[in-house]
A protein has these predicted regions:
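Residues at the start of alpha-helices and the adjacent loop-to-helix junctions
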Residues: 6-8, 22
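Positively charged n-region of N-terminal signal peptides that target proteins for export
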Residues: 1-4
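Hydrophobic h-region of N-terminal signal peptides that target proteins for export
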Residues: 8-17
Length: 278
């Protein structure tokens, strides 16, 4: 009898050892990989394509700017060199098209300011992968005020992934909540979806006339090499109400593409390099 009991006890220990990690353990490994992976992501040159659109609430386009950048590694991070900019905007009932700098009305007026602000946020030079680090809870710093839940597993492009839900530890805090798919083998993000954890406070909506219904972000990642994953697409569309009279629908999309691994020597020269080959 004792050998039988011992056998089942060993089975229980083995099962415990092979059971899925907790959501907190999974995200801790993700954070460690993100913190450690900064150097690996600096080994790549790539192009960044950004499209920002503002529309009136009736759906009529107010302004659109499409910008392409070449992203290259530097000693302190990355350098983003603008390759092209084009777009159109509504002026006196007619659409005016433009290409190249200076951008007409860039940073001026309501729509020019909105477009420039979003474009600047997406092209911050401190980001190693083209996205502001405060948008997603992937690094150690961004995870400290969140709680996580393992919601299941699924297969994405032939690879198993954990489905992790996240919410603020303080339910009264206005910050990000959402869901992430995490690769089970390398503990890297496959996709991340975020939304505001709750509505704007009533006082802000009532007294300041400000709200952002539908605000959230959706990002897809791609595996370039072992333990090296990059965001390859980013998108959001939401409505902006601000100080009673500002009312716009804002659409933002970003695509990272044409990745090319840089050699040690090319890192020094890539500041003035030509775009990667198609």
């Amino acid at each position: 009898m004792r050998p039988v009991l011992a056998f089942f006890m060993l089975l229980g220990v083995a099962a415990a050892r092979t059971s899925a990690p907790t959501a907190a353990e999974i995200m801790q490994k993700v954070a460690e990989n993100q913190d450690r992976g900064q150097k690996e992501r600096l080994a790549y040159v790539y192009e960044e394509h950004i499209d920002v659109i503002t529309r009136h609430t009736n759906g009529k386009l107010a302004r659109e700017e499409i910008t392409d950048y070449l992203v290259t590694p530097t000693a302190k991070g990355v350098n983003k060199k603008q390759l092209a900019v084009k777009g159109r905007y509504l002026k006196k009932g007619q659409y005016q098209s433009f290409a190249g700098d200076p951008v007409p009305g860039g940073g001026e007026g309501l729509d020019g300011s909105i477009v420039e602000s979003f474009r600047h946020d997406l092209t911050e030079d401190d980001s190693k992968d083209g996205l502001g680090k405060d948008l997603f809870p992937l690094s150690t710093e961004e995870q400290k005020d969140l709680k996580f839940e393992l919601a299941g597993e699924q297969v994405v492009s032939g690879r198993k992934a954990y489905r992790i839900r996240f919410t603020p530890a303080d339910r009264n805090e206005l910050t990000w909540a959402g869901e992430a798919l995490i690769d089970e083998e390398e503990f890297q993000p496959v996709s991340v979806y975020t939304r505001l954890s709750r509505r704007m406070p009533f006082a802000v909506r009532a007294l300041l006339g400000t709200d952002v219904p539908g605000l959230g972000f959706n990002t897809q990642y791609k595996r370039l090499d072992k333990d090296v994953w990059f965001p390859v697409s980013f998108g959001t569309e939401f409505r902006l109400h601000a100080v009673f009279f500002i009312n716009r629908i804002i659409t933002v999309s970003m695509e990272n593409r044409n990745f090319k691994r840089a050699s040690v020597d090319s890192r020094i020269e890539y500041g003035e390099a030509a775009p990667p080959s198609q």
